[in-house]
UniProtKB/Swiss-Prot annotation:
Its EC number is 6.1.1.9. It catalyses: tRNA(Val) + L-valine + ATP = L-valyl-tRNA(Val) + AMP + diphosphate. It comes from the Bacteria. It comes from Streptococcus agalactiae serotype Ia (strain ATCC 27591 / A909 / CDC SS700). Its main location: cytoplasm. This is Valine--tRNA ligase. The gene is valS.
Length: 884
């Protein structure tokens, strides 16, 4: 057990050194219990490009909540950590750092440049691990992986070679998305389309015989030097007689043919289309059909090459302006038509992507996608939370294109293909024997290796590896909806292809962290929040509580410091409650408390408030567990908050003072037992969300770590509807008197007369038996509880279930104001009656809802009607008094 709780909650003091203690105790490693059911999560590996942001904090907090709860529930848990090499992103960061020193990667060469990238990786991996520690993540570092580990690299090579041998990987020359800044190919989903201001440039291409001109339009006039034809529709009567003739390409005066192709739409524009096979995917297809040459007029950095004549060496956008000016001077520019259009931008560098003819490696997706789609109709399907994201996944799989997987980078998994001077190619896991072979210089798309993460980290391709046999498939993946296409989909089809199993049973999809105004956090807006700054001010537990309490599967969360203040205040409340309980504990042990609580629920000792709080605790355990199982952490948090703050702190702890300040030592022991037991259960329920503060408080009264403590379970013996109903009525009575006092500004310290009228004999007896609580909380001069009470003429009236409460305040009561208050009360009951009546008149609800749910609504209707009628009666009485 640790030192006594300090008078004030100080998160920095509570959290300091705690994480290292957990690591030293090895509490995050799997239990190794062969009888326990395995539960595994692989962390979505963060990129080693920099520090973690608030989105990472949210993502990992949700995972930690899940794994900590499962660990406490007795599962053999593994949360496997690791990081992603993030090819293009990391290489860009390192190149940026080198540029600041006046160095390029080409100055260093591949080997020395990669040394620099590894240095970067080591630096930022250490930073990320430090951040994980401050967040309190219960990962097993003995199994930490990196996507460029030798083990994972072996898996990558095997998958590539096997897919190649199965015909699912091929190499070819096609139009791809090209990033001129990173000088690499991009897959379709690495391209972000943005609406930008642009223009259609209309140009005249003169027939070779000079008899007429054909008007064509393009948004990219700088590519005209790659034009190899113009196309017209074969059924277009305007141009039928021109098919087979030539037009002259302006500026360079090159003749190109007029071809007939259905790609040309007679209804669009002039019906004439320039064909540039090396710079447009549609034109590439036309070129293939007509056996046209492919003329590339750009360098890999987005500058024009020597085929662009006088524009050689110019940036593509500068060349665009210059080409248009030249066309105008030659009389070939017809008009410029301004418009807004969608233009692809690189997700990583932000530059405009260039469609470019290039030799690349591709994954053939049709069969792999079909397998993934078919799996969703089996028992082995992946469950999405919320379910709507299954539709997102299926839609993408049904419309997927072949995946370009080669990248013109140095940082990454080098493609396991070799070429020799004879033009031969060898694909294998190991280099070919003999001399004269050169390995393909390209590397694989980062997502290619990430797609293998759930099984490659477990030891695959060794299917006999202990972790692979024990923890794969994994249990749950937690990730954002923004990478369903990039990552989730690819993990599913790769896992099915190579293991025959789904990679995970469940996918919990969360949204994005936004600022208070609902804007996405970004560098350009300057609204990003460093989670470490938040932790420094509020502590990790407060941040984790905010992130979990605001969570609903699939929904975004708005960050605000006001909410962080509320989170800190809640933990401070827990701290103060704990101090009160432990200061009054008098050496009571948890085992002794459990024994006494068992006697309480069996009605051998204790009072009704003890049984009430234990009943409510039991209900809370059930509801929290149920919502955790559905990943509804926000709902679970709301339930916990209400129980801890409202029911336990505001009511039960206050009610116990009636006993703790008395001279009855036997009752004190029972009350202390219920307090300690309930606190212990609360801390266990909270621990997955607030690991640091719960460990600190737990250490005051228990041995060992709360990390390995058992999670609360529903106990049927705790259920006590009689105690629940009675104390809820008691609370309603006390609350009603307090509210009435406040309405007429009668100080709580001033004694008043309280009359409680009830025709319910059981309720009357209950109120009388527990009148000590009523007196303690309402300070009456006189308290009368009876069915024979006659309502005083001038009295504040309130109606609770089963009783009417009158406060004779003749000298203070304004009849007009009391009437207004009662009218407002009447409107409230009318609204409640309308709502429940509407629900009960819905035949579908009555037919389909559970009988107990329908009965609950009927009970509400009866209760509201009673309150409505009583309020009507009281209004009539007050009107009569007013008229008199």
């Amino acid at each position: 057990m640790s030192k006594e709780l300090s008078p004030k909650y100080n998160p920095a003091e509570v959290e300091a050194g705690r994480y290292q203690t957990w690591l030293d105790q090895d509490v995050f490693k799997p239990s190794g219990d062969a009888e326990a059911k395995p539960y595994s999560i692989v962390i979505p590996p963060p990129n080693v490009t920099g520090k973690l942001h608030l989105g990472h904090a949210w993502d990992t907090t949700l995972q930690d909540i899940i794994i900590r709860q499962k660990r406490m529930q007795g599962f053999d848990t593994l949360w496997l950590p690791g990081m992603d090499h993030a090819g293009i992103a990391t290489q860009a960061k390192v190149e940026e750092r080198l540029r600041e020193q006046g160095i390029s990667r080409y100055d260093l060469g591949r080997e020395k440049f990669l040394d620099k990238v590894w240095e970067w990786k080591d630096e930022y991996a250490a930073t990320i691990k430090s951040q994980w520690g401050k967040m309190g993540l219960s990962v097993d570092y003995s199994r930490e992986r990196f996507t460029l580990d030798e083990g994972l690299s072996k898996a990558v090579r095997k998958v590539f070679v096997d897919l190649y041998n199965r015909g699912w990987i091929y190499r070819g020359e096609f139009i791809i998305n090209w990033d001129p800044a990173a000088r690499t190919a991009l897959s379709d989903i690495e391209v972000i389309h943005k609406d930008v201001e642009g223009a259609f440039y209309h140009m005249n291409y003169m027939l070779e015989d000079g008899s007429r001109a054909l008007e064509v339009a393009t948004t990219r006039p700088e590519t005209m030097f790659g034009d190899v034809a113009v196309a017209v529709n074969p059924e277009d009567p305007r141009y039928k007689d021109l098919i087979g003739q030539n037009v002259i390409l302006p500026i360079i005066n090159k003749p190109i043919p007029i071809v007939a192709d259905e790609h040309a739409d007679p209804e669009f524009g002039t019906g004439v289309v320039k064909i540039t096979p090396a710079h447009d995917p549609n034109d590439f297809a036309v070129g293939q059909r007509h056996n046209l040459p492919q003329v590339n007029v750009m360098n890999d950095d987005g500058t024009m090459n020597e085929l662009a004549d006088e524009f050689n060496g110019m940036d593509r956008f500068e060349a665009r302006k210059a080409v248009v000016a030249k066309l105008e001077s030659l009389g070939n520019l017809v008009k410029i038509e301004k418009m807004t259009h969608s233009v692809g931008h690189s997700e990583r560098t932000g530059v405009v992507v260039e469609p470019r003819l290039s030799t690349q490696w591709f994954v053939k997706m049709d069969q792999l996608a079909k397998n993934a789609i078919a799996n969703q109709d089996t028992e082995d399907k992946v469950e999405f939370y919320p379910p709507r994201f299954n539709d997102t996944f299926m839609s993408w799989m049904e419309n997927v294109h072949d995946w370009v997987i080669s990248r013109q980078l140095w940082w990454g998994h080098q493609i396991p293909a070799w070429y020799n001077v004879n033009g031969e190619m060898y694909v294998g896991e190991d280099a070919p024997e003999g001399d004269g072979w050169t390995q393909d210089e390209d590397v694989l798309d980062t997502w290619f290796s990430s797609a293998l993460w759930p099984f490659s980290t477990m030891g695959w391709p060794d299917t006999e590896a202990a972790d692979f046999k024990r923890y794969f498939p994994t249990s749950t993946l937690v990730t954002g909806y923004d990478i369903i296409f990039f990552w989730v989909s690819r993990m599913i089809f790769q896992s099915l292809e190579f293991t025959g199993r789904q990679p995970f049973s469940n996918v919990l999809i969360h949204g994005l962290i936004r600022d208070e105004e609902g804007r996405k956090m970004s560098k350009s807006l300057g609204n990003g929040i460093d989670p470490m700054d938040v932790i420094e001010k509020y502590g990790a537990d407060a941040l984790r509580w905010f992130l979990s309490n605001g969570s609903a599967p699939g929904q975004d969360v708005r960050f605000s410091y006001e909410k962080m203040d509320a989170s800190w205040n809640f933990i401070n409340k827990i701290w103060n409650i704990s101090r009160y309980i432990l200061m009054n504990n008098e050496g009571l042990t948890l085992d002794q408390a459990r024994e006494n609580v068992e006697k309480v629920v069996n009605s051998q000792v204790g009072n009704v408030t003890d049984r009430w709080i234990l009943h409510n605790l039991n209900e809370t355990v059930g509801k929290v567990t149920e919502n955790f199982d559905k990943f509804e952490f926000g709902v679970a948090g709301h339930i916990l908050y209400n129980f801890i703050w409202e029911e336990f702190a505001n009511w039960y702890v206050e009610l116990t003072k009636e006993v703790l300040y008395s001279d009855n030592e036997d009752e004190k022991v029972v009350t202390r037992s219920v307090l300690l037991y309930t606190l212990d259960q609360i801390l266990r329920l909270l621990h997955p969300i607030m690991p640091f503060v719960t460990e600190e408080i737990f250490g005051q009264y228990a041995e060992g770590s709360i990390v390995l403590a058992s999670y609360p379970q529903v106990n049927a013996t705790f259920e006590n509807q009689t105690a629940h109903k009675g104390v809820e009525s008691l609370k309603d009575l006390i609350r009603s008197v307090r509210n009435s006092r406040a309405e007429v500004n009668v100080a709580p310290s001033k004694p008043i007369t309280i009359l409680v009228k009830t025709s319910d004999s059981e309720l009357e007896s209950f109120f009388k038996d527990n009148s000590n609580y009523i007196k303690r909380f309402t300070n009456p001069e006189t308290l009368e509880i009876s069915s024979a009470i006659t309502a005083p003429e001038l009295a504040m009236t309130s109606i609770i279930t089963g009783a009417e409460i009158f406060l004779p305040l003749a000298d203070l009561l304004n009849v007009e104001e009391e009437l207004a208050r009662l009218e407002k009360e009447l409107a409230k009951w009318q609204k409640e009656l309308n709502m429940v009546g509407k629900k009960l008149s819905n035949e579908r609800f009555v037919a389909n809802a559970k009988p107990e749910v329908v009965q609950k609504e009927k009970d509400k209707q009866t209760d509201y009607q009673t309150k409505y009628d009583a309020t009507i009666a009281r209004i009539e009485e007050m009107k009569k008094i007013n008229n008199d």
